[in-house]
């Protein structure tokens, strides 16, 4: 019983012990004979008066299919169990208005991204932000969390299997792992790519053996970093191949998908392609990120209603309502209003089962690109969806399949424009065409993949090419803390490079002091740091402090971006403070929040540099 889980614990016992010590929670250990102790029984298992199981979530997916519209999957997790439980009760009150059972996504603390054995310092500087803590997960369930509404925790990062063991002990019905196949948001992380994939596979095995519902992989995250629909489908299918080896029941497997609400035919095509190709029984539709919705909850509701319509028409099993996209973690009341509004959309939109040759053609195009990527990854020819049965994936051992995946990532076969894994080959360039579809720019399709089978843009696209600086000014850019969200700072990097600056780019997850020291070493004129987890007040001043210690603060422009505070109400207070007082209270010369123009950033910081030199 639980043989794979026990084997994984034995193999990674030092990391398990580091997790226990780092987060002050009791974890499984080994007795004097080297056998695992302290591991709870698999689900179904009663925890805090409720029988927990991933099948509670699958039962909701079946309900969605029967009635014809998605179950809502709101995201809400605060730093403590008490806060999370209290805000959740306010959110649940709205669902009670129409007797709806939710699939509650309890967002975890950002430290989940980091290996506790190798990244303790990063963890320590990022505690208490991004969501609920590991000990808070256990306390939340003990308080009654998940008793009516099934819950899942997110476990993305370097060591998802450790987070999932904690969730199993706590009593969460589900979790997420994806993206397994690509580096989450392109962050640097601690590990090499193979370790990332291996740890993802360990997480899948634990879910399979303990009946945990799992969001296996994510079309959404690949889209967010410039992955095409076809590439995302290929990666999700590779994750399903690993799931076959893990023995994961398809009823407990879900794929997360973007819906953009820009082109309904395109959204329907991609949802149908995934439904046709994937064996996972559930699709979780999520409103596309990075569309810069209005910074107002009422106006934002209209923005997200477009995605809710698509989710219903596309037959999603679950849908994540959004509130306060521009400010991080919303209040329970704001999320409750988003749930209420979304349910109104679901209840007043008729699904006419839209059929069109345009949808059919796009669906076929997505599937063909995915098959081309898989052929290049697996060294096959003439691959079809019909051939990809469970037995198909068993022709390789799990180790051999992982080796093929890793080799494809390092060769540029599995590629997306803004992924920044340090040992992955980058080549592709994409364009978001006027019809809302992301396609490759001609000449920049994935390496080793038949270009004729990759959707390519017909638009006139100017490709950003890194070139030698034409100006003497130098700027260091990085995210600080346990933050792997590099999409925004990548855009800023390109803007400064296009303007001729010499850019030193440190990617994601850096200590503030390290950024300052690099700036000193290279003789930078400016430093730009970002954190989207609400750690601005804790981390940004440390950059300036270290520069002061080095005697360089007065010689450098130091600016920041992202979110100063993670919670809706706190972020609003800081925005007002910046408008009245400026950003000096954070030790910054300027702050560029969500929605800032890259061109404005370049101009304003350039003017600041000139003023320093004057």
Swiss-Prot record:
Keyword Metal-binding applies: yes
Molecular-function GO terms, alphabetical: 2-methyleneglutarate mutase activity; cobalamin binding; metal ion binding
Induction note: By nicotinate.
Highest taxon listed in the record's lineage: Bacteria
Gene Ontology process terms (BP): nicotinate catabolic process
Pathway per the UniProt entry: Cofactor degradation; nicotinate degradation; propanoate and pyruvate from 6-hydroxynicotinate: step 5/8
Catalytic activity: 2-methyleneglutarate = 2-methylene-3-methylsuccinate
Keyword Nuclease part of the UniProt annotation: no
Stated consequence of mutating residue 485 to Q: Loss of activity
pH influence on activity: Activity decreases rapidly below pH 7.5 in phosphate buffer, and below pH 8.0 in Tris buffer.
Cofactor binding comment, as recorded: Contains a mixture of adenosylcobalamin and oxygen-stable cob(II)alamin.
Activity regulation as described: Inhibited by intrinsic factor and iodoacetic acid. Competitively inhibited by itaconate, mesaconate, succinate, 1-methyl-1,2-trans-clycopropane, dicarboxylate and L-malate. Non-competitively inhibited by glutaconate and 1-methyl-1,2-cis-cyclopropanedicarboxylate. Not inhibited by acrylate or by the chelating agents alpha,alpha-dipyridyl or EDTA. Not activated by Fe(2+), Mg(2+), Mn(2+) or Ca(2+). Unaffected by K(+), Na(+), NH4(+), Rb(+) or Li(+).
B12-binding domain segment(s): 472-614
Cofactor annotation: adenosylcob(III)alamin; cob(II)alamin
EC number, UniProt record: 5.4.99.4
InterPro entries per UniProt: Acid_CoA_mut_C, Cbl-dep_enz_cat, Cobalamin-bd, Cobalamin-bd_sf
Keywords associated with the record: Cobalamin, Cobalt, Isomerase, Metal-binding
Job of this protein: Involved in the fermentation of nicotinate to ammonia, propionate, acetate and carbon dioxide.
Quaternary structure and partners: Homotetramer.
Full protein name: 2-methyleneglutarate mutase
Organism listed in the record: Eubacterium barkeri (Clostridium barkeri)
Lineage start: Bacteria, Bacillati, Bacillota, Clostridia, Eubacteriales
């Amino acid at each position: 019983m639980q043989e794979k889980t026990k084997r994984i614990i034995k193999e990674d016992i030092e990391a398990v012990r580091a997790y226990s010590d780092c987060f002050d929670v009791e974890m499984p250990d080994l007795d004097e004979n080297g056998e695992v102790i302290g591991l709870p029984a698999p689900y179904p298992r009663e925890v805090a008066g409720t029988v927990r199981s991933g099948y509670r979530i699958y039962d909701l997916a079946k309900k969605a299919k029967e009635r014809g519209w998605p179950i809502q999957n709101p995201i809400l997790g605060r730093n403590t169990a008490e806060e999370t439980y209290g805000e959740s009760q306010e959110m649940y009150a709205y669902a009670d208005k129409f007797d709806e059972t939710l699939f509650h996504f309890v967002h975890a603390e950002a430290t989940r991204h980091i290996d506790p054995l190798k990244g303790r310092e990063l963890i320590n500087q990022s505690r208490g932000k991004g969501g609920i803590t590991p000990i808070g997960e256990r306390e939340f369930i003990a308080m009654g969390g998940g008793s009516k509404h099934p819950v899942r925790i997110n476990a993305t990062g370097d060591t998802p299997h450790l987070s999932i063991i904690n969730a199993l002990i706590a009593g969460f019905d589900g979790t997420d792992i994806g993206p397994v196949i690509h580096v989450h948001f392109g962050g640097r992380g601690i590990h090499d790519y193979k370790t990332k994939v291996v740890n993802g596979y360990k997480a899948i095995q634990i879910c399979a053996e303990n009946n945990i519902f799992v969001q296996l992989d994510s079309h959404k995250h690949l889209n967010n970093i410039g992955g095409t629909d076809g590439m995302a489908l290929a990666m999700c299918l590779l994750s399903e191949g690993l799931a076959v080896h893990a023995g994961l029941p398809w009823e407990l497997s879900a794929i997360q998908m973007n819906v953009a609400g820009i082109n309904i035919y395109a959204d329907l095509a991609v949802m149908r392609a995934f439904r046709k190709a994937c064996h996972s029984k559930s699709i979780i539709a999520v409103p596309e990120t990075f569309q810069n919705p209005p910074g107002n909850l009422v106006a934002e509701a209209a923005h997200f209603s477009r995605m809710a319509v698509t989710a219903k028409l596309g037959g999603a099993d679950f849908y994540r309502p959004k509130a306060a996209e521009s400010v991080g973690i919303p209040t329970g009341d704001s999320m409750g209003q988003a749930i209420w509004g979304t349910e109104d959309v679901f209840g007043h939109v008729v699904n006419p089962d839209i059929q069109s040759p345009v949808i059919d053609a796009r669906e076929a195009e997505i599937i063909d690109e995915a098959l081309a990527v898989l052929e290049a990854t697996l060294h096959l020819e003439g691959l079809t969806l019909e051939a990809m049965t469970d037995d198909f994936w068993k022709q390789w051992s799990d180790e051999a399949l992982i080796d093929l995946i890793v080799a494809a990532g390092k060769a540029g076969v599995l590629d997306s424009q803004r992924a920044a894994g340090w040992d992955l080959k980058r080549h592709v360039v994409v364009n978001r065409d006027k019809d809302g579809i992301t396609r490759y720019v001609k000449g920049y399709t994935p390496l080793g993949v038949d270009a004729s089978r990759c959707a390519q843009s017909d638009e006139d696209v100017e490709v950003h090419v890194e070139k030698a600086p034409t100006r003497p000014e130098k700027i260091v850019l990085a995210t600080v803390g346990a933050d792997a969200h590099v999409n925004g700072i990548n855009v800023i990097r390109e803007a400064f490079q296009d303007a001729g600056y010499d850019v030193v780019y440190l990617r994601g997850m850096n200590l503030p002091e390290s950024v300052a020291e690099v700036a000193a070493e290279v003789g930078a004129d400016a430093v730009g740091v970002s954190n989207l987890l609400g750690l601005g007040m804790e981390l940004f001043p440390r950059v300036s402090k270290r520069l002061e210690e080095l005697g360089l603060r007065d010689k450098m422009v130091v600016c920041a971006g992202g979110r100063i505070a993670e919670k809706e109400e706190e972020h609003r207070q800081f925005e007002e403070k910046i408008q009245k007082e400026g950003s000096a209270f954070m030790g910054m010369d300027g702050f560029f929040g969500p929605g800032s123009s890259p061109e404005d950033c370049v101009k304003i910081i350039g003017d600041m540099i000139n003023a320093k030199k004057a």
